[in-house]
């Protein structure tokens, strides 16, 4: 049986690292910080980590706790323009780039980034 993407890239440890490094940047980014209504980003960090782990073949904790992901619906209340999309992608690219190539080889890195870019583009809901 082939390994899932989740297992192939180191499982929870890798996704924890990506998401924690991403949110460390979000906390300091004036564009993105406005998108998050909570003062504490821990809840958002946990939700993204659970979502990514599930999407890539890990535990189904996200769906068990929150139901179907419905990304567009869950992000609809927030104004997401090209500016927010680009800031999100910049932070996510930096977080993914911080993972060593033994853990996240070029093929898996590209697959992950392709998905993240597609998802970010699909969530844009405002021209401004």
UniProtKB/Swiss-Prot annotation:
Where heme binds, per the record, is at 75
Matching Gene3D superfamilies, A to Z? Globins
Q: How is the cofactor bound?
A: Binds 1 heme group per subunit.
Q: Which GO terms describe its cellular component?
A: plasma membrane
The covalently linked position for Isodityrosine (Tyr-Tyr), per the record, is 23-36
Residues with 3',4'-dihydroxyphenylalanine modification:
36
Post-translational modification, as annotated: Contains L-DOPA (3',4'-dihydroxyphenylalanine).
As for membrane topology, the entry says: Peripheral membrane protein
Keywords, sorted A to Z: Cell membrane, Heme, Hydroxylation, Iron, Membrane, Metal-binding, Oxygen transport, Transport
| Keyword Transport found | yes
State the source organism's domain of life: Bacteria
Does the keyword Cell membrane belong to this entry?
yes
Q: Where in the cell is it found?
A: Cell membrane
Names of the cofactor(s): heme
GO MF terms listed in the record are:
heme binding; metal ion binding; oxygen binding; oxygen carrier activity
PROSITE patterns associated with the record: GLOBIN_FAM_2 (PS01213)
Instruction: Output the GO biological process annotations, alphabetical, semicolon-separated.
Output: oxygen transport
| Family recorded in the similarity comment | Belongs to the truncated hemoglobin family. Group II subfamily.
Q: What does this protein do?
A: When expressed in E.coli and M.smegmatis, HbO increases oxygen uptake. Membrane vesicles of E.coli carrying HbO show a respiration activity about twice that of membranes without HbO. HbO seems to interact with a terminal oxidase. Therefore, HbO could participate in oxygen/electron-transfer process, suggesting a function related to the facilitation of oxygen transfer during aerobic metabolism of M.tuberculosis.
Q: How does it assemble?
A: Homododecamer.
Q: This protein is called what?
A: Group 2 truncated hemoglobin GlbO
**Lineage in the entry?**
Bacteria, Bacillati, Actinomycetota, Actinomycetes, Mycobacteriales
Give me the gene this protein comes from.
glbO
